[in-house]
Amino acid sequence: MEKSWMLWNFVERWLIALASWSWALCRISLLPLIVTFHLYGGIILLLLIFISIAGILYKFQDVLLYFPEQPSSSRLYVPMPTGIPHENIFIRTKDGIRLNLILIRYTGDNSPYSPTIIYFHGNAGNIGHRLPNALLMLVNLKVNLLLVDYRGYGKSEGEASEEGLYLDSEAVLDYVMTRPDLDKTKIFLFGRSLGGAVAIHLASENSHRISAIMVENTFLSIPHMASTLFSFFPMRYLPLWCYKNKFLSYRKISQCRMPSLFISGLSDQLIPPVMMKQLYELSPSRTKRLAIFPDGTHNDTWQCQGYFTALEQFIKEVVKSHSPEEMAKTSSNVTII
């Protein structure tokens, strides 16, 4: 009994000593923290606010970038072409996502040799909303059109993300390569707004399979757009890891050496037209064209006079040459329409 009491007394004294030592250590540790906060409290508070805002932006970037449900019912109803032969296609990506595509074939003269345009749309709506534009391309350019709904858009499964959209574009190109009725030597990529970033990425990774790219009213990158849209906040100082979606087109364009057409609407109120000019200047292509439309807005540049003429001339120029890289002696060409 006495031994038990002595053991308990020893444990009790040891616990009291440990608690006393821990409290002393805490006081020593708290002192520099209190002094630091007293001297630099304002800076620490600003840093905490900055980190909080960055965290919120990271979490909600998808909400700010992707609008698959605008206009309403875009996820429920996808308009289809009427009176025109077309194929409503579903394919699978490498990660198992089911995508919806619409293929509209040109059926006129020399149709087996017609170029095929893979059409990547912007960040809202679905492929059905692009049919008026696509049908005019069909008539004026005499091409096949393959319209793509990204994951999370229209009848495609999944949720949109940067890496997801890249996987989608790769799956679409792989599918085109399996079609015996499409000329593999005349594959053009077209991308508007967000679709331009997708097209640039796909071209940068598949230069041997792509004949040319055409991008319209697209951006340098998401960080560049954030600095433009949120100019009241020092977004330019945020490191890249703060961005969930980056779409670094200004870097990837350096890998796009195929013929390139940059279409810029100078009345674009969403993406600064200067970004299109900068992408054009960054392009290493020996055959690059910049078509400028002073009255062109972000979504409606295709309605400007001379729009389809510019695309037609570019496509004919690419198709006419057996070696696209030797197509022109001049390094660039700017057209103001």
Curated annotation (Swiss-Prot):
Q: Name one GO molecular function term.
A: palmitoyl-(protein) hydrolase activity
Entries under SUPFAM superfamilies matching the protein = alpha/beta-Hydrolases
Q: What is this protein called?
A: Protein ABHD13
Q: Which family does the UniProt entry place this protein in?
A: Belongs to the serine esterase family.
- What does UniProt list as catalytic? S193, D268, H298
**Keyword set includes Nucleotide-binding:** no
Q: Which UniProt keywords apply?
A: Glycoprotein, Hydrolase, Membrane, Signal-anchor, Transmembrane, Transmembrane helix
Cell compartments where the protein resides: Membrane
GO cellular component term of the entry, any: membrane
